[in-house]
Each structure stands twice: as C-alpha cells, then as structure tokens.
Amino acid sequence: MARIAGVDLPRNKRIEIALTYIYGIGLSRSKEILEKTNIDADIKCQDLNDQQVVSIREILESNYQIEGDLKRFESMSIKRLMEISTYRGRRHRLGLPLRGQRTRTNARTRRGGKKTVAGKKKAPRK
C-alpha cells in the first residue's frame, strides 16, 4: 500500500482515482500529476514501484498545497475574514450562509436542526 502525504492509498484502485483520496487533489489535478511523472493512469496502486511513488511525492511536495497545509491555509483565511469583520467573516461567525442564499426558510445545513417555536394560543371562550 502506497503512503503519500500521510494518506494510505487504496491498493486495488487505479492510481488516477487513488490520488483523489488525498485532501486537495481532485481528478483533474491527479491526471496532471501523472502526466508530469509519466505514469500511466490505468496502473493499479499496488503495481507502482518505489521510484514512481517517490516521483509522485516529490511533485506533490514541490508544487501543491495538500492535506494539513491546505486545511491550515483555509482556516487561517476564514479567521482573517472574521478578524477584519468583513460581511463573509460575520456570516461565518454567525453560522449563516455566505453567498446570498435565503435564510427565512431553508439554510438548514448551515444553521443546524429545526428549532420549534411555540405559536399563539387561542384564548378560551367564556
């Protein structure tokens, strides 16, 4: 099992798909990496030799921000927005949608579960 960037890649998948298990690498970036290293995309992960794994690691370390570095960068960007009190930063702080979606109804994913509020009670008749 190849271990790249702290992630165990699945042995029985094609290397093109297996690379997408690394945070920050999608299918197009995976294809780009394999082109640079001259590795066939149809090879199974278990069939890679050590030299091919090393070449993939070198390209990832030198050219791309992945895994922990990328997560840290994203969280720092959000913190910066919150510190300078931009609209997006305030929405992050309040846990609301950032991009203009309606919040009177919907937005359940961002706001959390449904909170029932008691309605008006009818006065009893005399």
From Swiss-Prot:
<dbReference type="GO" id="GO:0019843">
    <property type="term" value="F:rRNA binding"/>
</dbReference>
<dbReference type="InterPro" id="IPR027437">
    <property type="entry name" value="Rbsml_uS13_C"/>
</dbReference>
<keyword id="KW-0689">Ribosomal protein</keyword>
<comment type="subunit">
    <text>Part of the 30S ribosomal subunit.</text>
</comment>
<dbReference type="InterPro" id="IPR019980">
    <property type="entry name" value="Ribosomal_uS13_bac-type"/>
</dbReference>
<dbReference type="GO" id="GO:0015935">
    <property type="term" value="C:small ribosomal subunit"/>
</dbReference>
<protein>
    <recommendedName>
        <fullName>Small ribosomal subunit protein uS13c</fullName>
    </recommendedName>
</protein>
<comment type="similarity">
    <text>Belongs to the universal ribosomal protein uS13 family.</text>
</comment>
<dbReference type="InterPro" id="IPR010979">
    <property type="entry name" value="Ribosomal_uS13-like_H2TH"/>
</dbReference>
<dbReference type="GO" id="GO:0005829">
    <property type="term" value="C:cytosol"/>
</dbReference>
<feature type="region of interest" description="Disordered">
    <location>
        <begin position="97"/>
        <end position="126"/>
    </location>
</feature>
<feature type="compositionally biased region" description="Basic residues">
    <location>
        <begin position="101"/>
        <end position="126"/>
    </location>
</feature>
<comment type="function">
    <text>Located at the top of the head of the 30S subunit, it contacts several helices of the 16S rRNA.</text>
</comment>
<dbReference type="GO" id="GO:0009507">
    <property type="term" value="C:chloroplast"/>
</dbReference>
<dbReference type="Pfam" id="PF00416">
    <property type="entry name" value="Ribosomal_S13"/>
</dbReference>
<dbReference type="InterPro" id="IPR001892">
    <property type="entry name" value="Ribosomal_uS13"/>
</dbReference>
<keyword id="KW-0150">Chloroplast</keyword>
<keyword id="KW-0934">Plastid</keyword>
<keyword id="KW-0687">Ribonucleoprotein</keyword>
<keyword id="KW-0694">RNA-binding</keyword>
<keyword id="KW-0699">rRNA-binding</keyword>
<dbReference type="GO" id="GO:0003735">
    <property type="term" value="F:structural constituent of ribosome"/>
</dbReference>
<dbReference type="InterPro" id="IPR018269">
    <property type="entry name" value="Ribosomal_uS13_CS"/>
</dbReference>
<dbReference type="GO" id="GO:0006412">
    <property type="term" value="P:translation"/>
</dbReference>
